[in-house]
Amino acid sequence: MSRIGKKPVPVPAGVTASVEGQTVKAKGAKGELSFVVHDEVLVKMEDGAVRVDPRDQSKEARSKWGMSRTMISNIFVGVKDGFEKKLEISGVGYRAAMQGKNLQLSLGFSHEVVYDVPAGITVAVPKPTEIVVTGIDKQQVGQVAAEIREYRGPEPYKGKGVKYAGEKIVRKEGKKK
């Protein structure tokens, strides 16, 4: 069993952190985030680091312990550097373009797919076959990337569709004559 929770989360340079009850707040160059820690976990500031401990030795408290530590670490990284996910589009005629604040996707349907980008997330299209999703909240960046990918996930025969950069698509063999 992992014991990542034992390790205190150091507050990086350029980030101010505060603990108020069960809420951890972080403010940095990219913005401000807060995370409410589960009641089964105790959280406190010690020597420029945030320490997380289980309230007792119950299974629920121990299961929330490591997750809470990682979530706090993610908000520190998010407000300092931010998070980024890249998507690649492959297929004849498949492309993406920004239309104001919305992402317009041509994915082989009879209509264009228009994705409304949520607040706090930035979507860029450096090339028509490449989408870059950035933001300070790791969960929200991953969610937006997953929603874009869901419109036309990669298919196993030709690999056409939207996939994460670096994602391996398990290919299938076609019909034999």
Curated annotation (Swiss-Prot):
Pfam families: Ribosomal_L6. The keyword Phosphoprotein does not apply. GO terms for biological process: cytoplasmic translation. The keyword Ribosomal protein applies. Disulfide bonds: none annotated. Keywords: Ribonucleoprotein, Ribosomal protein, RNA-binding, rRNA-binding. InterPro entries: Ribosomal_uL6-like, Ribosomal_uL6-like_a/b-dom_sf, Ribosomal_uL6_a/b-dom, Ribosomal_uL6_bac-type, Ribosomal_uL6_CS. GO terms for molecular function: rRNA binding; structural constituent of ribosome. GO terms for cellular component: cytosolic large ribosomal subunit. This protein binds to the 23S rRNA, and is important in its secondary structure. It is located near the subunit interface in the base of the L7/L12 stalk, and near the tRNA binding site of the peptidyltransferase center. Belongs to the universal ribosomal protein uL6 family. Part of the 50S ribosomal subunit. This is Large ribosomal subunit protein uL6. The gene is rplF.
